[in-house]
Amino acid sequence: MVYICSPLRANARFTMEENLERAKAICRHCAVNGVLAIAVHLYFTQFLDDNIEEERVCGMEHGKALLAMCEEVWVFGDIISSGMQAEIELAEELGIPIKYFPDVDAWLGGKIC
Protein backbone atom coordinates (compact mmCIF):
# COMPACT_ATOMS: atom_id res chain seq x y z
CA MET A 1 0.00 0.00 0.00
CA VAL A 2 1.20 3.51 -0.87
CA TYR A 3 0.59 6.50 1.39
CA ILE A 4 -0.34 9.62 -0.58
CA CYS A 5 1.17 12.77 0.93
CA SER A 6 -0.21 15.97 -0.60
CA PRO A 7 -1.49 19.32 0.70
CA LEU A 8 -4.93 19.67 2.25
CA ARG A 9 -5.24 23.25 3.46
CA ALA A 10 -5.15 26.19 1.06
CA ASN A 11 -1.70 27.39 0.06
CA ALA A 12 -0.21 30.00 -2.26
CA ARG A 13 -1.44 28.11 -5.32
CA PHE A 14 -4.57 26.10 -4.50
CA THR A 15 -7.67 26.29 -2.32
CA MET A 16 -8.53 23.46 0.05
CA GLU A 17 -11.19 22.28 -2.39
CA GLU A 18 -8.68 22.24 -5.25
CA ASN A 19 -6.20 20.32 -3.10
CA LEU A 20 -8.88 17.73 -2.33
CA GLU A 21 -9.71 17.42 -6.04
CA ARG A 22 -6.02 16.92 -6.83
CA ALA A 23 -5.75 14.24 -4.14
CA LYS A 24 -8.81 12.49 -5.60
CA ALA A 25 -7.26 12.59 -9.07
CA ILE A 26 -4.01 11.15 -7.71
CA CYS A 27 -5.84 8.33 -5.93
CA ARG A 28 -7.98 7.59 -8.97
CA HIS A 29 -4.88 7.44 -11.17
CA CYS A 30 -3.27 5.05 -8.69
CA ALA A 31 -6.37 2.83 -8.51
CA VAL A 32 -6.87 2.47 -12.26
CA ASN A 33 -3.17 1.66 -12.63
CA GLY A 34 -3.22 -1.11 -10.02
CA VAL A 35 -1.68 0.79 -7.11
CA LEU A 36 -3.40 0.45 -3.73
CA ALA A 37 -3.09 3.96 -2.31
CA ILE A 38 -4.52 5.80 0.66
CA ALA A 39 -4.83 9.55 1.12
CA VAL A 40 -5.87 9.98 4.73
CA HIS A 41 -6.78 13.63 4.20
CA LEU A 42 -9.49 12.48 1.78
CA TYR A 43 -10.79 9.87 4.21
CA PHE A 44 -10.71 11.63 7.56
CA THR A 45 -12.15 14.92 6.26
CA GLN A 46 -15.36 13.01 5.51
CA PHE A 47 -16.18 12.94 9.22
CA LEU A 48 -13.60 15.10 11.03
CA ASP A 49 -13.52 18.89 10.70
CA ASP A 50 -10.02 20.05 9.76
CA ASN A 51 -10.89 23.54 11.02
CA ILE A 52 -11.37 22.25 14.58
CA GLU A 53 -7.87 21.77 15.97
CA GLU A 54 -8.79 18.81 18.18
CA GLU A 55 -10.33 16.97 15.21
CA ARG A 56 -7.43 17.92 12.92
CA VAL A 57 -4.95 16.45 15.43
CA CYS A 58 -7.10 13.31 15.74
CA GLY A 59 -7.05 12.83 11.97
CA MET A 60 -3.31 13.42 11.78
CA GLU A 61 -2.62 10.89 14.55
CA HIS A 62 -4.77 8.23 12.89
CA GLY A 63 -3.10 9.08 9.59
CA LYS A 64 0.32 8.45 11.10
CA ALA A 65 -0.84 5.02 12.26
CA LEU A 66 -1.92 4.20 8.70
CA LEU A 67 1.32 5.60 7.28
CA ALA A 68 3.25 3.10 9.43
CA MET A 69 1.41 0.26 7.63
CA CYS A 70 2.42 1.44 4.14
CA GLU A 71 5.26 0.18 1.96
CA GLU A 72 6.01 3.57 0.39
CA VAL A 73 5.15 7.24 0.76
CA TRP A 74 4.54 9.26 -2.39
CA VAL A 75 4.83 13.03 -1.94
CA PHE A 76 2.94 15.17 -4.46
CA GLY A 77 3.45 18.84 -5.27
CA ASP A 78 6.26 21.31 -4.83
CA ILE A 79 4.76 22.96 -1.73
CA ILE A 80 5.39 20.94 1.44
CA SER A 81 2.96 21.84 4.23
CA SER A 82 3.77 21.36 7.91
CA GLY A 83 1.49 18.31 8.00
CA MET A 84 3.24 16.82 4.98
CA GLN A 85 6.63 17.52 6.55
CA ALA A 86 5.59 15.61 9.67
CA GLU A 87 4.52 12.66 7.50
CA ILE A 88 7.81 12.73 5.59
CA GLU A 89 9.80 12.80 8.83
CA LEU A 90 7.81 9.87 10.22
CA ALA A 91 8.40 7.85 7.04
CA GLU A 92 12.13 8.59 7.31
CA GLU A 93 12.16 7.50 10.98
CA LEU A 94 10.37 4.27 10.07
CA GLY A 95 12.63 3.60 7.08
CA ILE A 96 9.74 3.74 4.61
CA PRO A 97 10.88 4.64 1.07
CA ILE A 98 9.74 8.07 -0.13
CA LYS A 99 9.18 9.12 -3.75
CA TYR A 100 8.69 12.75 -4.77
CA PHE A 101 6.43 13.92 -7.61
CA PRO A 102 6.69 17.75 -7.67
CA ASP A 103 4.71 18.17 -10.92
CA VAL A 104 1.32 16.62 -10.21
CA ASP A 105 -0.19 17.62 -13.56
CA ALA A 106 2.65 15.98 -15.49
CA TRP A 107 2.40 12.83 -13.35
CA LEU A 108 -1.33 12.64 -14.08
CA GLY A 109 -0.78 13.26 -17.78
CA GLY A 110 -2.45 16.65 -17.97
CA LYS A 111 -3.85 19.58 -16.02
CA ILE A 112 -6.65 18.64 -13.63
CA CYS A 113 -7.53 21.98 -11.99
What residue spans do the PLM features occupy?
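Catalytic phosphate/metal-binding cores of nucleic-acid and nucleotide-processing enzymes, i.e., regions
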Residues: 1-113
